[in-house]
Amino acid sequence: EDEDWVVVRGDGCTVYQGTTEVKREIRQTGLSGAMMGKGNHRHFMLKEIHEQPAVIGDTLQSYVDPATRTVALPALPFDWSKVSRITLTGCGGAFYVCMVAKYWFEQIARLPVEVELGSEFRYRAPPLPEGGVCIAVSQSGETADTLAAVRYAKAEKQTVLSVVNVPESAIARESH
């Protein structure tokens, strides 16, 4: 959890929040060391660029039924026809992803979209309309500024969705 810290010893670990010991459910991640390392690439960005075709293919495969040639997306906690505005937020490369997604949402879904830099969103504190949806984009799901943006959007009664690579991440847990 946010602001937890852990002491790891040979016989186990102890989790603290501040100076208080807390009990947390122990979960094992599905990620392997190979997935988290940069392999033979000079840096993580280059690794991610080279992984894009496989990642996109794996993602689409989970939603496409090859027998019927149809796409089946999971149910969302809102009705798209009642969405008053979409706010996209992210930092770094995720911010640029949001800028591209803005065009797609506006051109295809015909919904108004704002793109907010995660590090500025909560400080700028824009008014967010009732019935709005905030989509947070973060590769790790742990980007502190994007997490703060998620919390601001939730406080403003927005439905919050996230696009992350780590289902156990803080941003994923705090999204709807």
Go through each PLM region and give its residues.
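Glycine-rich phosphate-binding loops that contact phosphosugars or nucleotide phosphates
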Residues: 81-175
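N-terminal segments that mediate ammonia production and transfer
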Residues: 1-81, 94, 106-108, 123-127
